[in-house]
Regions:
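C-terminal alpha-helical interaction appendages
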Residues: 1-157
Length: 157
């Protein structure tokens, strides 16, 4: 049984690490968080099976625990802004590469900090306001730092 638990723990850890690398690259190196969340998901899975839930039901419950508070992604939001609003200036794969760098920028952080970012934030009316503010912040960062882009940034004005 010990081998099974270790395999399941590895499954939840790998599942979480994969998700984080795609949506929360800033959390990929947070090993204590990953271990704690994977352990909690494993416990939920085992307890659910023990309580009589089917394996798919237990998997679903464990996934809820695994991804708790990880549905709204600053990274995904910023990539979306860069892809949609700066398509000509920052062609793929630049948005995915630039987003982690921009997430460390104080102006970008301050923009996100104005909002209560819950799991369902992207369905709220405030999301559009955040999106617009992020677009403006990126324009200001490009102009203030005279960052090179492909195409003409002044066309945005």
């Amino acid at each position: 049984m010990k081998t099974t638990n270790k395999k399941e723990l590895s499954y939840f850890r790998l599942k979480l690490e994969s998700y984080l690398s795609e949506h929360f690259p800033e959390k990929v190196e947070d090993k204590p968080f990953i271990k704690a969340r994977a352990d909690e998901a494993l416990t939920t899975y085992c307890d659910s099976v023990e309580e009589g839930f089917s394996y798919p039901e237990a998997e679903s419950m464990a996934s809820e625990v695994l991804y708790r508070d990880l549905h709204f992604s600053k990274y995904d939001t910023l990539v979306s802004v860069l892809e949609n609003e700066f398509e000509k200036e920052l062609p793929s794969p630049l948005p995915e590469r630039l987003a982690p760098i921009l997430l460390k920028n104080r102006a970008i952080q301050e923009t996100f900090d104005k909002y209560n970012l819950t799991d369902d934030f992207d369905a709220s009316p405030e999301y559009d306001t955040l999106y617009t503010e992020l677009t403006g912040t990126v324009v200001l960062l490009i102009e203030a730092n005279q960052l090179p882009t492909i195409g003409d940034v002044s066309a945005l004005e």
